[in-house]
Amino acid sequence: MTRGPVTDLGFTRAKIKIASIDIDQDLRRIDAAASQLQDSGHLAVDAMTAYDAQTGPAAASRLANCGLWWFEDVCDPLDFETQAKIATAYGGSIAAGEALFSLAEAKLLNLYGGMRKDKDILVFDPVHCYGLPGYLRIVEHLTSEGWPRQAFWPPGGHLFSLHVVAALGLGGAEVTPLAFRPFRGLPDHKGVTAGYADLPQAPGISFEMHTEARQLFRTAFSLH
């Protein structure tokens, strides 16, 4: 089967949004997306916190046999009871943390969210977490609690995660090649090869070498 545009760009893994339609339709979408990758283990799904105490465990049960890379944002980020129930019903990897901003919230997720250090994924956002210092506090605390650095996968959409991951030795960074313009993709002349990207040998966090982002800043601040 012909590969899709994401794999044509060098990506070997992908993520799709689910939970806005019937679960049977989502399962068909998952099959279609996985067919463009090596297998379903290279595909993650993001429920965008759509499920609740009733719908979440049922959806998790249906998704359990898909063999997905991970199942993300399964319910309201502060509904730790439902999060824990879904983790029990779902044998694969759960991803959580993107909509949690503080160290206190990260501690609650770790204590009450049913997250499993040997398989689950932490997707705290270094931009949302009261900035990089807040993110560093979360990483420091959770690694001291036994979480491996490989469990941390910060989101994309702001050109910041790749540098954070490289500096801290984390699991990986989400890159959005098409969405979130102008903060999409990678710095100019940098691409993805077999699922990996390297950093430019230049100071900064990649805004400086990203034409779309740089032009936006110049326009916004009347820079010439």
Functional labels for PLM-detected ranges:
Residues 34-37, 169-172, 221:
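Structural signal for hydrophobic packing residues in well-ordered secondary-structure cores
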Residues 204-224:
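Extended hydrophobic packing segments that form well-structured cores
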